[in-house]
Amino acid sequence: MEAFMVSFERQKDAKFCMYRENIPNFESTLSSITKSTNSIKILLEDISNVQKVITDPCEQSCSSCSPNVLNKFLGIEEKLVNNVEIPDSVPQKSTRPCLDDEKEGSSVVQPPESGNRHVQLISEQEFKSIPKYQLGRLTLDNLNEIVGKMDEFLTKKNAILGKTNKQITRQDREVLDNWRELEIKAKGRLPTTLFFIENDIRPLLTERLRLSFAKAIPCLRHIRRVREERCGPLTFYYA
């Protein structure tokens, strides 16, 4: 055993000599490493002491510990808040909730139903302004149904016109070609590309309203829902 210890000391001295020769500032580096090791050792001892304190059972029940002692043990700094104003009386809720809700509801402005429609629906007041000889047997619901189909077609057309070349399908391409042919026939008289002809709307209507489409156009022109432009045999309509 003594021979082993002697050989171990010799090997250690030989290694230290080699380190001193090859490592610059070996003594200062070794001293800093030693200090760091000692600091780590002290830190580990503190951690073990804290763990021992935590694991040890408290001599008294937790309910007997005061908040100050508990905060001090946990390392929590306690800040006192002064000059806190407490209201003398709490505002009471009205005993008439139904009336209050009605007042609040009356002050809320409801948004219009029209939104971003291309052709707005007809109001009852506008419907009454249409001459009786133009209306015939057409009702407000009939006209609004026709107006809804016009808006549906223009919305779809606007969506197709807004597509990029990559988004356009083969069917969309055929529809666009037909619209361009109609634009050529219009000879530049239309102020917008969102137009339609009678054949665009008729397939969207019911059989009964298809017969009334020609009679509904003068009514819609009267209240300025649609405008028309005649170019040869074709009549173009736009909002």
Curated annotation (Swiss-Prot):
GO biological process, one term: attachment of mitotic spindle microtubules to kinetochore
Keyword Signal belongs to the record: no
Source species, domain of life: Eukaryota
A Pfam family per the record: SKA1
Region feature (Microtubule binding): 116-239
GO terms of molecular function: microtubule binding
InterPro entries: SKA1, SKA1_MBD_sf
Keyword Cytoplasm carried by entry: yes
Broad class of the protein's primary localization: cytoplasm
Localization in the cell: Cytoplasm, Cytoskeleton, Spindle; Chromosome, Centromere, Kinetochore
Keywords: Cell cycle, Cell division, Centromere, Chromosome, Cytoplasm, Cytoskeleton, Kinetochore, Microtubule, Mitosis
Disordered: annotated segments: 87-115
Gene Ontology annotations for the cellular component aspect, listed alphabetically: cytoplasm; meiotic spindle; mitotic spindle; outer kinetochore; spindle microtubule
Subunit note: Component of the SKA complex, composed of two copies of ska-1 and a single copy of ska-3. The core complex associates with microtubules and may form dimeric assemblies. Interacts with ska-3 and microtubules.
Function of the molecule: Component of the SKA complex, a microtubule plus end-binding complex of the outer kinetochore that stabilizes spindle microtubule-kinetochore attachments, promotes alignment of chromosomes at the mitotic spindle equator (chromosome congression) and assists suppression of the spindle assembly checkpoint. Kinetochores, consisting of a centromere-associated inner segment and a microtubule-contacting outer segment, play a crucial role in chromosome segregation by mediating the physical connection between centromeric DNA and spindle microtubules.
Family under the similarity heading: Belongs to the SKA1 family.
Protein name listed in UniProt: SKA complex subunit 1
